[in-house]
Amino acid sequence: LLLHSIHEPHIAYQDSVSKNNEIEGEFDVILANPPFTGSVNKSTISESLTNICSTTKTELLFVALFLRMLKKGGRCACIVPDGVLFGSSNAHKALRKELVENHQLQAVISMPSGVFKPYAGVSTGILIFTKTGAGGTDNVWFYDMKADGYSLDDKRQPIEANDIPDIIERYHNLEKETDRKRTEQSFFVPKAEIVQNNY
């Protein structure tokens, strides 16, 4: 923080999903890589989070927390394990429904397992959404990342294959993505189809 001329940072040491964290509607942008797995004691969880999705799983609670902490119109890009994207529990579906119905889920970028090796080998994705409180999801852009410029083994050596520049280019030109087929690396899925598949 000192390198960015922040001489008096506000740093709080607390459990972010607990009742002690009362931050609400304060941030314009949240970029996050929260803990992937784990559960917390139900009695300590903030009720405002369990109202969105009744669970003790941190991977879901953190996304609910980001929604609470954003200002209306605030944007978030967060890394989540695949379970958040494809989990079939009521809590998983409730969180996805919240994003699709009450906010604007803009993009889901699937990343290959190995991008966080040697620390974690789980498959992950990036959720990009805007807090609206009034919906706004019409189509969701999906991108299937195959490579990030590094080998997907424990060594993570630099390699030539890297989808990140392509992701950025396509994301900034989404109007060119509308006619892509589902067999391509990126494509849109209409909200109606997401709803039909139970989110």
Question: Which residues make up each language-model segment?
Answer:
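S-adenosyl-L-methionine
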Residues: 1-24
